[in-house]
């Protein structure tokens, strides 16, 4: 018989789905127990008492019956707040969903995530406050590569370790090559130094110390191409939320009514 205990915990609603006629399954990223699926009987009934606490993109202090195996159960909520900006903006919604999907795929259920719970919470806070959703998502993507077991060498040259020369990315060498060793891989990415700079920066930047971000559009486009290629070739993920972002990215100019007002993100380092 599975062990269970009544616990208080903080959590972020990852997603929810209807179950049977009037019930619901809600997956919550918790600060203490990792990702847990909760069964809420009667959640689809009118005036369900926990309705506000199980909305998408909600963070709350919960109390519940935590089961080691199988479904857990929510009993009460002490406080709940929703990421309002994310909830009301299709673009931000897509990026936040993608971040949560990456976490769902990257970590087993019922295992504490440690610092990653705080990272995800802070990433959503930054996006909700108006920081560039694509750049915050790229930071998460790059730092998650280690979780997926494919962390590239981004601190120095993968061959000689030098850190003071121009760099390019090499899939064959699993990281950066300094200019002296570019000849070793004719299929290197041929990336700009500005894009490589941000790739390296995003791999170590502390989300809690970001005050602003300002990356030129051309660099953003190149960064997206680099990170997409890393995920396609080394991680091998094909998430629906990422496909949706790519479609938005491609057809952004055709959807002016959905475009977000440019965010106020000046950068922690400036992109001169």
Swiss-Prot record:
A Gene Ontology cellular-component term: bacterial nucleoid
Keyword set, alphabetical order: DNA damage, DNA recombination, DNA repair
Organism of provenance: Latilactobacillus sakei subsp. sakei (strain 23K)
Role: Involved in DNA repair and RecF pathway recombination.
InterPro entries: ARFGAP/RecO (IPR037278), DNA_rep/recomb_RecO_N (IPR022572), NA-bd_OB-fold (IPR012340), RecO (IPR003717), RecO_C (IPR042242)
Full protein name: DNA repair protein RecO
Stored NCBIfam families: reco
Tagged with keyword DNA damage: yes
Family according to the record: Belongs to the RecO family.
Superkingdom in the source lineage: Bacteria
GO biological process annotation, one example: DNA recombination
């Amino acid at each position: 018989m599975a062990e269970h205990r009544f616990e208080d915990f903080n959590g972020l609603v990852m997603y929810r789905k209807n179950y049977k006629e009037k019930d619901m399954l809600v997956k919550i990223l918790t600060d203490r127990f990792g990702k847990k699926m909760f069964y809420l009987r009667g959640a689809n009934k009118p005036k369900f008492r926990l309705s506000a606490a199980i909305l998408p993109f909600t963070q709350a202090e919960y109390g519940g019956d935590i089961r080691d195996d199988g479904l857990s159960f929510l009993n009460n909520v002490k406080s709940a707040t929703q990421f309002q900006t994310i909830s009301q903006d299709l673009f931000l919604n897509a990026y936040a969903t993608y971040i949560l999907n990456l976490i769902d795929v990257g970590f087993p259920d019922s295992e504490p995530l440690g610092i990653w719970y705080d990272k995800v919470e802070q990433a959503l806070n930054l996006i909700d406050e108006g920081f560039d959703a694509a750049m915050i998502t790229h930071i998460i993507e790059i730092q998650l590569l280690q979780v997926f077991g494919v962390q590239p060498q981004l601190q120095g040259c993968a061959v000689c370790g030098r850190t003071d020369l121009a760099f390019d990315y090499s899939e064959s060498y699993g990281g950066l090559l300094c200019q002296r060793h570019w000849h070793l891989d004719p299929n290197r990415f041929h990336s700009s130094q500005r894009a490589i700079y941000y790739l390296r920066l995003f791999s170590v930047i502390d989300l809690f110390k970001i005050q602003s971000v300002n990356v030129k559009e051309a660099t953003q486009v190149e960064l997206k191409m680099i990170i997409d290629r890393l995920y396609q070739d080394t991680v091998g993920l094909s998430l629906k939320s990422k496909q949706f972002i790519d479609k938005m990215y491609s057809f952004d100019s055709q959807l002016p009514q959905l475009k977000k007002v440019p965010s106020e993100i000046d950068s922690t380092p400036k992109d001169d």
